[in-house]
């Protein structure tokens, strides 16, 4: 504050003193100034501080005193210190001196002489202090101590007077040069200008360097510095005679002209100095040595003035003449030849010509240009002749050509017709003069001076021809352009200059070849002109030029291929050269494309395009993608068909090579995407591709009409490419914005990914226009692509233009008559567009199923359905009504008034549709949150403003939705132009339209081509009488269409429900937890009910039980570890929807054939990878895909993990995966649960409603059915009921009652019944009557295969005529019986494709021959290369070898092309085969009468996608299937479901105790049976068991309703029945002891030992009978099975199990044996009897035997249970209960006694060859089917994982042994009519089947029972055939003598 007051006082005093000067006032001012400075003596900036500067200026008055006083000494000391520190203070100090001088003169009126004395005193002090600094400061360095001398340097240069002081200058020069060339300040100081003209060379050079770095100095700025220059100008007259001083002046002037604004020099004219006149006059002087300096000055002058140099007084031609004709220039160029300087740093005296050309109009001064080029070229040539290369002259020539070429390329595109002659003249001048110069050059290597100078111009010269060629081609593509006129000169250039360039390739001059490739890349997409019927004037000239280029350049490519491999590799090491060669690969011209790809193949060491692309991406990823971006950019300039075709092909290869899920670079190498350079390259590539798509769909309609088929293929490929890119969007997004080198965890890329999505949104603008296509296949692809694009845009909240929204919306709501879009496609479009639609639009949606919309919109993760997944409801138009030759032709507008009526009608109809739920639409819009303003609008504007865009889009936009062709009448508008039936005039018209059209897609012909055609007279609208239609049972077409649409909606929801929840739940489980549902209320089980209110209630019950069952499978699999672990290494990961897909590689040799997709696996970290005890180290996952390689396995595992846990899954970490179970069945059951509400039988399922049995089963109907199908009465009733009932029909089939035969009868009845209903046929349509199709299912493969084999033998129709329906078996091949394989879909398809496979083999042979030729050519080429190298090294003439090598290379290229074509054809064939395969599969399924599958396999994708409808579904063994499995086959529109089963036999196997507890083990059959058992049809006659065996089951399990077939006692009679201890039916009371095994299952050793004795008794006593496969041992417990097998194996060895079956009860269901031994096991009085109390299990055990049943158990504990009490009491009552110990049984009767007893029997046992006779039981005795034993089959994989309670003996793979015992009983009069010969041999066929099965059977499978021609009888062996019998003999058992068996 005080400081400011002091300054204010100083200022006031100064002002007072200046107004009234006085001595006292001046002293007061000095006192105040000194005081103020003293106060601020700590401030180092006295002078540059504005306030202190005032005080300093006032203190300068101290120098006016005569003597130095103490004040002046103090002031000089402190001022000197500050002037040594601050350059700014120096400047202000000298300005203060000027101010001080002004004050002294003007204010204080000093005497000039006095003032001069004062100023001199100050000057002397300045010289003194600077001298001191220069003398005393040590050597200059970077320390602060050097600052004073640096400030001294600056002050000296700032003041020229000080600089030129005689005392200062020498001292300054020495110290300044000592310090080097210092740069003191950014601003110029006058001393620099002064030194510019100094005679001291070093200081002058320093000044020149300082001035060279300064930007242009303005007029005003330089006036401050002009003093030294003006002084030099004034002394010019003295210097003119001194050449050295003139040289110095001219050099300085030249430099100033380059850096000072021309306005300053114009101002010098007023000072009597005209720079232009001075320089031009100097060129006219006789000073030859000064000529170069004046020319340099002229260059600087022209540079400074630019076009402002020229005035009316000065013209360019005059300047040229003055120079070239001047004596000085002539003498200088003539006398100084070879004396020119080649120092490129020196001023170039020839450079003025370049500056001159930049100041004139090139196009108007071609003659002047010609003069300069001639003069310079001749001068250069003259100097070359004397052996001197004038580098400066060549530099100027290069600069001149560079300027001219640049100007030419700027002028050419904008030149009008008036300038084209001048343009042509300039073109010719440039080409001719450069070619002359080029031939003078000796370009040895890349380092030569000539090449460095001429390199850029050489590239210009190449582009000169290529640019014209490209412009001509672009003119052809766009007729609006004016063609250039000098194409002929280009043709000559290709014949001359370009041919000369071939030497460059021959001599392997890399540096020039690189430029050639780079230049030629600009025409990489130019194509030959297609033939046109209308000739174009310049066409032949263009073709000549193009052919010349192709011929020359293709020869260059051949020459390059002749190089050594190392040379070719070196060539492409340069990125720009690589881009040039790679871009030429895309060329539509075959010769260029083939030659270029051959070079890249060579350096990639591969011979296929695919391998080459892969190698390029591995080694040069960024270069490859950048090169492709360059090609895409080039295509945007030409937009031609040929280029687009190659772009799509090669870029698809690139994308596939990078992102293929199996072989892609990102899949194989997790670190591949970490380089920032790669990320940026891929981002640019992505953007370029979508920009290409945007323009592709614009220009597509403009391409020539003769390429129709090719256009179809190209558009299909392009749409597939779009689809591919959309599918990998997440991978691309992760690549670009995901992991990088420094990242350790994944980065969320959604925000950044929106930039990528915007590219897609921009392309959506043009793709949407193609919704009006008339090619259904392409239209399907367009719809799929658009829907996927919309999905991505919605996910990333990308805005879409309103125009696009309107287009898609109009297409989605267009009626069927106006578009060929199917209902499904329109629905897909509408659903995908929903987030962008308003509330009002959504409320008036034509898709009136609210549940449909809600379901689809909520399942955002679902993929869109493809067209082949939709139901086949789309109306197919007759081929005759649609032009097949023009797939894209958009039909003309319908100029019909009825159109408006239809639209209004449609609108009113839409209003009646159901509205979507408000909360659904609100949620959708909120989730999208997409602003209505669109970034896509700018693209539309840009596209519309492009002059090259055709009007096709405008016509597309204006055209109304396309109507379907009328089916009522044939219209010429839609007829095929190539149709032979059309008239000649129509052909002419079509032809002319083709000629005049811009392309295949043009709409230009709409208005004109049909304007003259008269419209057919329209019929008046007539209203139908709906009442009359109802009475006639006719459906109105509108209602029919509406019904069809609704059916389609329901079908889609039935077949493809959203199942993401299934995997979300399962994959979210912790496999180490005890339970998964403890905290989840939704997963708490509730008791199953008999009926349900709705599907939601049903789902709440069954969904938790289903997941509990899955959880039980998980826990069981984790404990058992059935499958070996697989070691994996993590590669990479990606996010898909709400899951994470992680890709692994396994190099483990572990066999992995057991893996398949949908497997649930346990993934854990390897021991070496971290803490395996961490729960997060274990995760459930699903196999998404599997790729098996020769040495490794590649897996994609899908997981449901939190993003925070992703860091646990980093690349290269080792994991272990172990398969737990296959989730296919559970997944299909979940899908069935989700689709229940949409099933036709949904309500019947919820209500457990069973259709009542028909009451009109008259005797006539009964007798007819029994006669036609050969069945008994209850079977006939069941057949009749199933054929007339809708809904559910229950057939109860107890054991042996002929269920299979009944099913065959149902099949015949359903397939041969005829529909009597009337249908309304739409006029013009032929409605095909859909034939009845049957879907037959069962829980197990064995049951299905049994039915299938019976169908194979034939089925009877309702007239009793045998026929053979078409049958298809669907399912997993390994689980299907060998004898049913021929019916599988795969086998049927293979037969259909055999012919195609032969063609493929032929193609493979051709490829092999070509490969051999190619290998031979390669060897020859390599040999020639070696010989050529030797010749060249020895200097021999190698022209012959070079010619041979070129020819060999051409052959190699042709063979390579052939191999690539073959590979492409092979790939195309494979693609076509895949399509054909799907078509054949679909056709086979469509044509099949019967489809057989397990319940799980009925949900196979093949059936889901085939669009089939099965009105009738038959489920066998329905009581053994869980309820959800029974629902799976009902999703195909089933209206009648026949369930065949037995509720008294085993229930479904369920692993989860919780699920079983709440009723999950109750089948749908049983639930319905319990509700309506009176409606079940009972098959009451059994043909399996001996009456003694069936008596108890019939009484206790079937209320005595199960009757025996006729003569069953005789049929099942056997020799051992006479043995008193054996007999037919026995209960052996064995007092054994039960025990627990390690697995908590029970076993009984005593019972096992007794059964062994019982078996020995049988085989010892009856050695003449082959018991192989006849005996089965059944027990409820698995440990007892192991105990039995152990004892039998110890006794007989492993061979025993080929003759004897030992299984659990569950494993024996469905099988039958002659003898069954049942081990009860339970012997404890306190523990109960466990599983034995299950009536169904006991029923199964007791009903497996045909002839004998032996029960082994402990009676006392068993009788605690009511059922066993009844069983044992019944046995005792019947006298079949035996209380025997093992010893008692062993010794009960000797073998001889038994033999004697048998010998006395009346049985006919005369010889061993005589069979045991028993009467046959059947409808017809002579045709009776025999008893046979089928080997068991593995059940369907779907049921492998099911089980029951923990200690029950349930096998993982339930064995099924279905037996063909469906024999029926009927009256002897009833016979099977019209039996063919094949029927008589049916048993023989089955016998052969059994034999072949035995040959392939394992040791555990049952044997085969040989049968003779007399069906039903066992055959005696000629000798003891049983190996078991032989084994018994070896242990001391002797067979009875033959005499015992002879009849007495």
Swiss-Prot record:
Provide ranges: composition bias, Acidic residues.
985-996
GO terms of molecular function: ATP binding; ATP hydrolysis activity; RNA binding; RNA helicase activity; transcription termination site sequence-specific DNA binding
List the keywords (alphabetical).
ATP-binding, Helicase, Hydrolase, Nucleotide-binding, Nucleus
**Bias-annotated ranges (Basic and acidic residues):** 916-929, 939-949, 1843-1852, 1869-1891
Give TM segment ranges: none
Q: Name one GO biological process term.
A: RNA 3'-end processing
CDD domains, A to Z: DEXXQc_SETX, SF1_C_Upf1
Binding sites annotated in the UniProt record for ATP: 1293-1300
The protein's matches in InterPro entries, at most eight in alphabetical order, are given as:
ARM-type_fold, DNA2/NAM7-like, DNA2/NAM7-like_C, DNA2/NAM7_AAA_11, Helicase_Sen1_N, P-loop_NTPase, SEN1_barrel, SF1_C_Upf1
Identify one Gene Ontology CC term for this UniProt entry: nucleus
- Location in the cell: Nucleus
Provide the E.C. number(s) assigned to this enzyme: 3.6.4.-
Using the UniProt record, name the top-level EC class of this enzyme in a single word. hydrolase
- Bias (Basic residues) occurs at 1912-1922
**Where do the record's region annotations for Disordered lie?**
908-999, 1824-1944
Q: Which family does it belong to?
A: Belongs to the DNA2/NAM7 helicase family.
Task: Return the protein name.
Answer: Uncharacterized ATP-dependent helicase C29A10.10c
Give the organism, scientific name: Schizosaccharomyces pombe (strain 972 / ATCC 24843) (Fission yeast)
